Amino acid sequence: MSYQVEFATKWSDFDPNRHMRHTAYNDYAAEVRIRYFTHAGFPVDEISKDNIGPILFTEHTSFRKEIHSGENIIVNAKLSALNEDKSRWKMRHEIFNESGKVAAIIDVYGAWIDLEKRKLAVLPKKYDTLLDGLDKTEDFELIKSKRN
């Protein structure tokens, strides 16, 4: 089973058309990523003590079904790609509406940044298992290094 979190949607998630605003989907996906890090034993505030933090290069959202005001949603996280040194990663989030249908799929491409140097970084070895607890997507791939 993939890592997932159930949320009660809130009034501010919705737009004048009475469905969830597009940015709210991405906010919930981001929340799941951060909660996953804590679940894996590495809260972001602990990682930041080593001057490292997660960043995104891209975030692509595909909307499938509406989510209406008052619905509870489930948001999961799966690993869809990873490079050899685990410095770059891709995650896929599926957001399910209250009737269990996929309402959106969000694909993100991320990495780690050195918070002082403002350059891409590799996580210290003590975080090697951070992403190991995520299920892999069926189309999981290895990200080829651009350094070679």
Regions found by a protein language model. Give the residues of each.
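Hydrophobic beta-sheet segments that form the core/acyl-binding groove
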Residues: 60-98
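Conserved GNAT-family N-acetyltransferase fold
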Residues: 29, 93, 106
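Hydrophobic core residues within well-ordered beta-strands of beta-rich domains
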Residues: 3, 55-57, 73-75, 89, ...
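Hot-dog-fold acyl-thioester-processing enzymes
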Residues: 1-58, 114-148
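Generic short beta-strand
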Residues: 11, 92-94, 110
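Residue-level signal for glycine
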Residues: 100-102
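C-terminal edge beta-strand
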Residues: 8, 107-108
